[in-house]
Protein backbone atom coordinates (compact mmCIF):
# COMPACT_ATOMS: atom_id res chain seq x y z
CA UNK A 1 0.00 0.00 0.00
CA UNK A 2 1.25 3.44 -0.87
CA UNK A 3 0.95 5.90 2.03
CA UNK A 4 0.58 9.58 1.18
CA UNK A 5 2.31 12.03 3.50
CA UNK A 6 0.41 15.10 2.43
CA UNK A 7 -2.98 16.52 3.22
CA UNK A 8 -3.20 17.79 -0.36
CA UNK A 9 -3.90 15.03 -2.87
CA UNK A 10 -3.78 15.56 -6.62
CA UNK A 11 -5.61 13.64 -9.32
CA UNK A 12 -4.70 14.18 -12.97
CA UNK A 13 -6.20 12.33 -15.91
CA UNK A 14 -6.35 12.16 -19.67
CA UNK A 15 -7.30 10.09 -22.71
CA UNK A 16 -4.68 9.70 -25.47
CA UNK A 17 -4.83 8.16 -28.93
CA UNK A 18 -1.57 6.20 -28.89
CA UNK A 19 -1.57 5.22 -32.57
CA UNK A 20 -3.75 4.79 -35.70
CA UNK A 21 -1.77 2.37 -37.84
CA UNK A 22 -4.59 1.41 -40.23
CA UNK A 23 -4.38 4.87 -41.85
CA UNK A 24 -0.80 4.47 -43.09
CA UNK A 25 -0.19 0.71 -42.98
CA UNK A 26 1.87 1.03 -39.81
CA UNK A 27 3.66 -1.75 -37.96
CA UNK A 28 0.89 -2.51 -35.45
CA UNK A 29 -1.53 -3.18 -38.32
CA UNK A 30 0.77 -4.91 -40.83
CA UNK A 31 3.55 -6.37 -38.65
CA UNK A 32 3.99 -9.67 -36.84
CA UNK A 33 5.86 -10.66 -33.70
CA UNK A 34 6.68 -8.41 -30.76
CA UNK A 35 5.76 -4.75 -31.28
CA UNK A 36 5.60 -1.78 -28.93
CA UNK A 37 4.39 1.81 -28.91
CA UNK A 38 5.07 4.29 -26.14
CA UNK A 39 4.38 7.95 -25.45
CA UNK A 40 5.65 10.25 -22.71
CA UNK A 41 2.75 11.83 -20.81
CA UNK A 42 3.38 15.00 -18.79
CA UNK A 43 1.22 15.81 -15.77
CA UNK A 44 -0.49 19.21 -15.61
CA UNK A 45 1.36 19.90 -12.32
CA UNK A 46 4.22 18.21 -10.46
CA UNK A 47 3.46 15.71 -7.73
CA UNK A 48 5.43 15.72 -4.47
CA UNK A 49 6.62 12.17 -5.23
CA UNK A 50 5.93 9.70 -8.04
CA UNK A 51 2.14 9.10 -8.11
CA UNK A 52 0.22 5.90 -8.71
CA UNK A 53 -0.80 5.69 -12.38
CA UNK A 54 -3.75 3.59 -13.61
CA UNK A 55 -4.27 2.88 -17.32
CA UNK A 56 -7.25 1.45 -19.18
CA UNK A 57 -7.97 0.89 -22.85
CA UNK A 58 -10.76 3.29 -23.78
CA UNK A 59 -10.82 2.28 -27.47
CA UNK A 60 -9.25 -0.48 -29.49
CA UNK A 61 -9.82 -1.46 -33.07
CA UNK A 62 -8.44 -4.96 -33.63
CA UNK A 63 -8.70 -7.30 -36.61
CA UNK A 64 -11.30 -10.03 -36.01
CA UNK A 65 -9.20 -12.59 -37.88
CA UNK A 66 -6.35 -12.67 -35.37
CA UNK A 67 -5.93 -13.52 -31.70
CA UNK A 68 -6.13 -10.48 -29.41
CA UNK A 69 -2.92 -10.06 -27.42
CA UNK A 70 -2.26 -6.82 -25.55
CA UNK A 71 -0.19 -5.52 -22.65
CA UNK A 72 -0.81 -1.98 -21.39
CA UNK A 73 1.41 -0.52 -18.68
CA UNK A 74 2.95 2.65 -17.29
CA UNK A 75 6.74 2.86 -17.00
CA UNK A 76 9.28 5.43 -15.81
CA UNK A 77 6.78 7.19 -13.52
CA UNK A 78 8.22 10.42 -12.07
CA UNK A 79 6.80 13.49 -10.34
CA UNK A 80 6.30 15.15 -13.73
CA UNK A 81 5.07 12.33 -16.00
CA UNK A 82 5.24 8.72 -17.18
CA UNK A 83 5.62 6.53 -20.26
CA UNK A 84 2.39 5.00 -21.57
CA UNK A 85 3.25 1.64 -23.18
CA UNK A 86 1.21 -0.71 -25.40
CA UNK A 87 2.67 -4.04 -26.51
CA UNK A 88 1.38 -6.84 -28.70
CA UNK A 89 2.88 -9.97 -30.27
CA UNK A 90 2.17 -12.88 -32.58
CA UNK A 91 -0.26 -12.29 -35.44
CA UNK A 92 -2.38 -9.68 -33.59
CA UNK A 93 -3.35 -6.83 -35.94
CA UNK A 94 -4.14 -3.58 -34.11
CA UNK A 95 -5.56 -0.69 -36.14
CA UNK A 96 -5.72 1.88 -33.33
CA UNK A 97 -5.64 2.25 -29.56
CA UNK A 98 -6.75 5.01 -27.20
CA UNK A 99 -5.70 4.78 -23.54
CA UNK A 100 -7.29 6.58 -20.59
CA UNK A 101 -5.04 7.32 -17.61
CA UNK A 102 -5.40 8.55 -14.04
CA UNK A 103 -2.58 9.61 -11.72
CA UNK A 104 -3.14 10.14 -8.00
CA UNK A 105 -0.59 11.24 -5.44
CA UNK A 106 0.57 13.80 -2.91
CA UNK A 107 1.03 17.45 -3.86
CA UNK A 108 3.06 20.05 -2.05
CA UNK A 109 0.94 22.16 0.26
CA UNK A 110 1.52 25.90 0.72
CA UNK A 111 0.78 25.46 4.43
CA UNK A 112 3.46 22.76 4.83
CA UNK A 113 7.07 23.65 5.47
CA UNK A 114 10.24 21.91 6.53
CA UNK A 115 12.15 22.84 9.67
CA UNK A 116 15.86 22.72 8.95
Where are these regions (language model features)?
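Short, hydrophobic/aromatic beta-strand segments
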Residues: 50-55
Amino acid sequence: MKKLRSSTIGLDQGDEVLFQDFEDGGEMWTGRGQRERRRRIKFSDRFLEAPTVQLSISLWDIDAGSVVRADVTSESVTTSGFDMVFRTWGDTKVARVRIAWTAIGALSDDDSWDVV
